[in-house]
Regions:
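Conserved structural core of kinase catalytic domains
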Residues: 6, 25-77
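Alpha-helix termini
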Residues: 20-29, 108-109
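A short glycine-rich, hydrophobically flanked beta-strand micro-motif that places a catalytic Asp/Glu
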Residues: 32-39, 94-107
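Short, glycine/acidic-enriched loop or turn micro-motifs at the edges of active sites
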Residues: 54, 100, 121-122
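Terminal, low-complexity interaction segments
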Residues: 85-87
Length: 182
């Protein structure tokens, strides 16, 4: 029988905040990852406290999913996605699939920066990416390719369900070193 904590997504998320890449990047990781402050007891049980990413009016920031449905994959968002990809490739912070509803748009002087508010860590059976730089790079590249694939679906006519579309995703392998420095 599994302990209840095994199924507690907050506990897994908290453990993901302890990954070495997050600890190494304490001064910079919060540019694209909501900062975690620890636990607070609530009437519903323990809750994980993270940053509230806000828009210019102080309201919760819009999700990437919401933005895409209103504006499509415009230049502002393409740039924000490129900046997030560059950050993940450099920092080697491990994430689960980068879901558009788990990325919010924080306004900045260039337009937006994407901030991951949920989905840190690994959901793989063998967590090799935790122990090997090569596998961490491979894991991140696969997650980024999956995100690009998902973004194309988000702005499509959605005539095919995401479940059916996702089944066709194929990881195309690691990028060449020259490409990754662009």
């Amino acid at each position: 029988m599994f302990r209840e904590a095994y199924f507690d997504d907050n506990r897994r998320e908290y453990a993901a905040y302890q990954q070495p890449a997050v600890a190494r990047n304490q001064c910079t990781y919060d540019r694209h990852v909501a900062r975690c402050y620890g636990w607070v007891r609530t009437t519903l049980g323990d809750g994980l406290v993270t940053d509230l990413i806000a828009d210019l009016n102080g309201n919760p920031a819009q999700t990437l999913e919401e933005y895409l449905s209103e504006h499509g994959l415009d230049t502002l968002i393409q740039n924000a996605v490129c900046n997030l990809a560059r950050f993940l490739r450099t920092s080697l912070i491990l994430t689960k699939n980068l879901m558009p509803h788990n990325l919010v748009l924080a306004p900045n002087d260039l337009g937006y920066r994407l901030v991951l508010i949920d989905g840190l860590g690994l959901s793989t059976f063998l967590p090799l990416a935790k122990y090997s730089q090569y596998f961490a790079q491979r894991h991140i590249e696969k997650r980024l390719q999956w995100l690009y694939f998902r973004l194309e679906w988000e702005v499509s006519d959605r005539s095919i369900s995401w479940r059916d579309t996702e089944a066709t995703f194929r990881f195309s392998g690691m990028r060449l070193e020259v490409e990754s420095k662009r």
